[in-house]
């Protein structure tokens, strides 16, 4: 068969028409230096700030410094085998982490990958780690409580849903113990919890996970781990990853509680990255934007209104507000709260719980200093019964501290002063609490009622603890229905006051403590 020129021409045209080329332009660059987890890249003209850069070996780096002829990026993961001359690519994506209810009960790393050996995670999608916080119009005022289960905290420095309450103190003052108990207290409250461990020993984190599991709180909690052995980049990013996981619940009309343990170590990791990127150091060698590092994180903890939730879920959830409550932890050096990072975080948050070494060492645990601990918005969210009964507690402690200072020098004290000192000592003793024993509202109310209305007057100081446990055992066995109802409602009225009075008076007549 012989084809003439016209047929050949038609055949070529047909083939050309059918020829399909899929071309994709990709920005590539070359590594020019590698040191301490920081790589400098020549090229990548189209890279964005914070963009993920694909490295050889299925690894990524994040672009942090965009300079005229090079890009400074921080490697997420091992970097020992990276070398000059290797080719890297832009991805066009910002770092995202998996989110959803499938993460509850799991231990994950900064990138949301499981590290607990329980298999793959069934996530509901991905969310960027850096998100702009909700605006003023999208927010609602804080008016619902988060019960920590600690008498000292719930009575004097109450925390509301959507609040940011700083927990600050020296090392070994019970900061982590306090937040772990707060997470355990949320078992039946419906509040989902996220615990972000930054720069801690792996053994400490394993211990925390075990305690949460023992007390039935792990199923309600996501644990995000960037341990001390992880790179500075992963320690710096861990809080943002945890926050993205918490926002999943907030934006769908649910309540979540996130703990950052601790932000001092995150600031140190960020300082390390910044100095290696040759950014100019400022006070205490921290970079100039260390305030923004924490403010953009903590502003994402908020209570959002029903319109925001409805808009976010495209009408799937209506009439429900969502909240993300943050409990950041800051570790001070020798009680110095005027250092750079502590003052920054104090100014960003809605109050602080100050834990003192001297109180902790003298056996007062939780070691809350009621004088300088404050909650700026929590009182509006406090349960009615606790609010009504805790009014005299702070005053009694303040007067006791003032008088105790004078009592050291005065030999003869009048009866009124002695009575005040005795009452202050008993209240201090009453506010002590063992770890892993969070108290429901009803039990706190009963104990505070006994303190407020003078029922501790006939009890010796060393018998306060046994008096309290016997009173609670008596109330829970003989008035179980009332205690359950009070724990559920948290209301306070004349009939509830009368019932509390009856319980305490009958118990004191009994005298079995």
UniProtKB/Swiss-Prot annotation:
SUPFAM superfamilies: C-terminal domain of alpha and beta subunits of F1 ATP synthase, N-terminal domain of alpha and beta subunits of F1 ATP synthase, P-loop containing nucleoside triphosphate hydrolases. One of its GO terms (cellular component) is proton-transporting ATP synthase complex. F-type ATPases have 2 components, CF(1) - the catalytic core - and CF(0) - the membrane proton channel. CF(1) has five subunits: alpha(3), beta(3), gamma(1), delta(1), epsilon(1). CF(0) has three main subunits: a(1), b(2) and c(9-12). The alpha and beta chains form an alternating ring which encloses part of the gamma chain. CF(1) is attached to CF(0) by a central stalk formed by the gamma and epsilon chains, while a peripheral stalk is formed by the delta and b chains. PROSITE patterns: ATPASE_ALPHA_BETA (PS00152). The gene is atpA. Gene3D superfamilies: 2.40.30.20, ATP synthase alpha/beta chain, C-terminal domain, P-loop containing nucleotide triphosphate hydrolases. It is found in: Cell inner membrane. This is ATP synthase subunit alpha. It comes from Haemophilus ducreyi (strain 35000HP / ATCC 700724). It catalyses: ATP + H2O + 4 H(+)(in) = ADP + phosphate + 5 H(+)(out). It is a peripheral membrane protein. It comes from the Bacteria. Pfam families: ATP-synt_ab, ATP-synt_ab_C, ATP-synt_ab_N. GO terms for molecular function: ADP binding; ATP binding; proton-transporting ATP synthase activity, rotational mechanism.
